[in-house]
Amino acid sequence: GMSEQGLIVTIEPSEEMIARSEDYLRRAGLRERVRIERGRALEVMPHLSETFDLVFIDALKEEYGQYLDLALPLLREGGVVIVDNLLWGGQVAGEIRSPDQTASTEALREFNQKFVRHPQLRAEVLSIGDGLGYGVKTNSGPSVF
């Protein structure tokens, strides 16, 4: 679990979702353990100065590569990065079923290659749910688990 001094930092652009989240956190007695940064992640992340143990990416698929580039300098060595939806309903590995998801699917195909080959990560894509990326930051270069 998270230590008593631990803090979760989350980024959210929607004021409606922030209000809803704050309400849930308050009712759960966890409001003081979570800091919500308002805005788009690509605009907020460059201003973060903390070092993180864990980064979870679940946002616009076309921007995943940029999120990873911004997150890695903030992640401690040995820290974990988790990325959601990397198999995109199977479309990443096969035929695109929905034309409106072509850009997202192609972006995820590119991202998955970048992720598993990244020189600062030991990473893989797991076929859990809709595809989960799991990587550990290391300075020793990539390897397969």
Task: List each model region and its residues.
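S-adenosylmethionine/decaboxylated-SAM
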Residues: 1-145
